[in-house]
C-alpha cells in the first residue's frame, strides 16, 4: 500500500488489519517479453455502480502507445492514472454519501426501496469531481512483477 494516502482515507479505515486490499494487474507483451505491474488499493466496502465502466473508459482515454512514465509501460501508465482518479472519486463519493445519511437504517438498508435510495446517494460523483480527471495526476503507485521466479 502506498505510504502517502490522502488523510480522508481515515474515513474508510483503510489501515484496519482486517481490511481487504484490491490488487489490479496491468500486463502487456512487447519485444522484451511480458511486463506486469501490480497496484494495491484499499477497498471501500460499500456498493458503487459503474466503477468498472468508468475505470475502463479512463484507461482507454489515457492509453498512449508512445507514452510511459516512471519506467512503466504505456498500459501500466494509463492504468495507474485511471486508478488514481477512480480511487479519489470513490473516496469522495463515499464521504459525500456518509454526510447524506439521515439515520442508521440508511447505511444498512434491507428492503429494495431503501437499497435504491442508498445507491442513489452513492452514485459516482464524476461531474462534481471532474477536476480530478481533467487535472490528472502522477498516477497510483505500482510495482513491477518479476515472474522469473515463478514455475
Residues covered by each model-derived region:
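Conserved phosphate-donor
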Residues: 1-49, 83-86, 90-97
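Short, low-complexity intrinsically disordered segments
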Residues: 12, 35, 60, 138, ...
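Short linear interaction motif-like sites in intrinsically disordered regions of transcription factors
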Residues: 15, 30, 63, 141, ...
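Conserved active-site and cofactor/substrate-binding residues in soluble primary-metabolism enzymes
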Residues: 19, 50, 54, 73-81
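A broad "ordered helical/assembly scaffold" signature
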Residues: 37, 58-59, 80
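PLP-dependent amino-acid enzyme catalytic core
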Residues: 41, 61, 76-77
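Short, small-residue alpha-helix embedded
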Residues: 48-71
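Charged C-terminal helix
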Residues: 70-151
Amino acid at each position: 500500500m502506498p505510504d502517502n494516502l490522502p488523510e480522508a482515507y481515515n474515513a474508510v479505515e483503510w489501515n484496519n488489519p482486517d481490511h481487504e486490499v484490491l490488487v489490479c494487474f496491468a500486463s502487456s507483451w512487447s519485444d522484451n517479453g511480458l511486463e506486469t505491474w501490480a497496484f494495491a488499493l484499499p477497498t471501500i466496502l460499500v456498493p458503487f455502480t459503474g466503477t468498472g465502466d468508468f475505470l475502463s473508459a479512463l484507461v482507454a482515454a489515457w492509453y498512449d502507445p508512445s507514452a510511459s512514465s516512471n519506467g512503466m509501460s504505456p498500459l501500466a501508465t494509463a492504468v495507474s492514472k485511471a486508478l488514481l482518479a477512480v480511487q479519489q472519486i470513490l473516496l469522495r463519493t463515499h464521504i459525500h454519501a456518509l454526510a447524506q445519511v439521515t439515520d442508521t437504517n440508511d447505511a444498512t438498508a434491507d428492503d429494495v426501496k431503501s437499497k435504491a435510495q442508498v445507491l442513489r446517494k452513492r452514485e459516482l460523483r464524476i461531474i462534481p469531481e471532474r477536476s480530478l480527471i481533467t487535472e490528472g495526476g502522477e498516477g497510483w503507485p505500482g510495482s513491477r512483477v518479476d515472474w522469473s521466479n515463478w514455475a
